[in-house]
């Protein structure tokens, strides 16, 4: 039988891997052809560097999360895992921030810069991007909870000795 703390950690890691994998799949499959004033164009995630960064960052975090699932519980390398959890949480924060900024401009445009919103013409694409961002945010929140749980688990024995 697993200890409750280990079970919680495993459950959070499974949720995080699922959410990052979903974010990658949803964003990587987002594309739609649209027409604007008789001009045809195709909206793809690869057209936007921030969306490419989002996919790459989430893919890296997915692989990391999957590998950590098989890490033995009693290993002394858990300190390294704790540090890497922090690094990958920051990677998720930066990629989601960049993608959210671009998505906001795509949805609302920017009147001062003369950028028109595109979501009215490519709604399926925008909905997929929104879904990927929601999955990414779920992964981020899960990683933050996991990080706090790991820090507490790591520091608790030290605090009890003091």
Swiss-Prot record:
Keywords: Cell membrane, Membrane, Transmembrane, Transmembrane helix. The chain crosses the membrane at residues 7-27, 50-70, 80-100, 131-151. GO terms for cellular component: plasma membrane. Residues 1-6, 71-79, 152-162 are cytoplasmic. It is found in: Cell membrane. Residues 28-49, 101-130 are extracellular. It is a multi-pass membrane protein. Homodimer and heterodimers. Belongs to the Casparian strip membrane proteins (CASP) family. This is CASP-like protein 1C2.
């Amino acid at each position: 039988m697993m200890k409750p703390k280990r079970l919680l950690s495993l459950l959070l890691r499974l949720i995080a891997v699922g959410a990052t994998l979903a974010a990658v799949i949803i964003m990587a499959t987002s594309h739609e052809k649209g027409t604007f004033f008789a001009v045809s164009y195709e909206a793809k995630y690869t057209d936007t560097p921030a969306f490419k960064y989002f996919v790459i960052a989430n893919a890296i975090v997915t692989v990391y999360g999957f590998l950590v699932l098989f890490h033995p519980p009693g290993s002394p390398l858990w300190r390294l895992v704790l540090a890497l959890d922090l690094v990958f949480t920051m990677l998720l924060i930066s990629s989601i921030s960049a993608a959210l900024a671009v998505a906001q401009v795509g949805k609302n445009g920017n009147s001062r810069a003369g950028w028109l919103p595109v979501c009215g013409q490519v709604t399926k694409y925008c909905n997929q991007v929104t879904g990927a961002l929601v999955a990414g945010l779920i992964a981020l929140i899960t990683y933050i909870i996991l990080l706090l749980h790991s820090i507490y688990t790591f520091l608790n024995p030290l605090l009890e000795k003091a």
